[in-house]
Design a protein with these regions (language model features):
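Amphipathic alpha-helical polymerization modules
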Residues: 1-115
């Protein structure tokens, strides 16, 4: 099966993690004016093998509690979040290209069996 190799499992799981990060960044930006709102981010911990034998990128959402930029307690910095969004975009594009390359390699695998 196409997604049975370790590299593809890690890349697709990485895309899931980057998708979660993108949602968190957009959530932060949408709460730019919310009093007391604290920035959330996604932390990538490591690659692990789950109980089903599939490799995944472990990630979790964390709240940045110890910084405050404004008197109302909000700590969202639009410039920082915009930069994170761009960085996330570049990482997603890289993984899309790698996955696309892996998939295109399967076109060149000779088909077994009688003609």
């Amino acid at each position: 099966m196409l997604f049975d190799n370790k590299q593809m499992q890690i890349m697709t799981s990485g895309l899931d993690a980057l998708s979660t990060r993108q949602r968190m960044i957009l959530h932060n930006l949408s709460n730019l004016e919310t009093m007391g709102y604290k920035t959330k981010d996604v932390v990538f911990e490591d690659v692990f093998k789950n109980a089903r034998g599939r490799y995944e990128v472990r990630h979790k959402v964390v709240t940045q509690e110890n910084t405050t930029l404004r008197a109302d307690g909000n700590n969202v910095d639009a410039d920082v979040e915009s930069m994170k969004l761009y960085e996330n975009y570049v990482q997603q594009q890289y993984l899309y290209q790698k996955i696309s390359g892996q998939i295109s390699n399967y076109r060149y695998v000779p088909k077994a069996g009688p003609k």
